[in-house]
Amino acid sequence: MSYLFDTDAISEVLRHRPSKVYLRWLAAIPREEQFTSAVVTGELYKGAYQYAARELHLRSIEERVPPVVTVLPYDVAVSRIFGMIRAHLEEAGLIIPDADLQIAATAIYHGLELVTGNIQHFGRIPGLRLNPVLARSRSASPHRRG
């Protein structure tokens, strides 16, 4: 099984005190089965630029994300899936932010299971396989602080 890590799943690893349950699970996943999306890295960079300690956060992303997970591009094939999902959800009266739909489309196109802490949110996207390990690890450690 191969996985695409959502922004919150990558952010968890970058936290000062990440979930030990999540880190143990992640350590068992071979490097070649770990992916994220260029959309996720964009969200991470946006967050870094919002911090006063911008350079520290930027360096953390650059040193700890691309060397560890394969960053998949957002391309024409993925954008077609995005368009299909977006149209389907709009017809159903559901609105999900475009970045999340782009991340989901990347996972669907590449046949990857999405690791996210936001199962309810992404669960509305047809054809998307979700992995609840991050959400479960958070419920196992409700008093964890960053």
Would you name each region that the model predicts?
Residues 36-39, 117:
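Substrate-recognition element of Asp-dependent hydrolases with the DxDx(T/V) motif
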Residues 30, 67, 125-126:
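Short, structured coil segments at secondary-structure junctions
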Residues 6-7, 44, 82, 107, ...:
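Generic structural signal for small/hydrophobic residues in well-ordered secondary structure
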Residues 1-36, 48-64, 91, 136-144:
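Short, well-structured N-terminal submotif of metal-dependent ribonuclease cores
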Residues 70-117, 143-146:
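Active-site neighborhoods of divalent-metal-dependent phosphate/nucleic-acid chemistry enzymes
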Residues 2, 101-142:
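Acidic, metal-binding active-site segment of PIN/NYN-like and related structure-specific nucleases
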Residues 9-10, 40, 78, 120-121:
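Alpha-helix capping/helix-boundary segments
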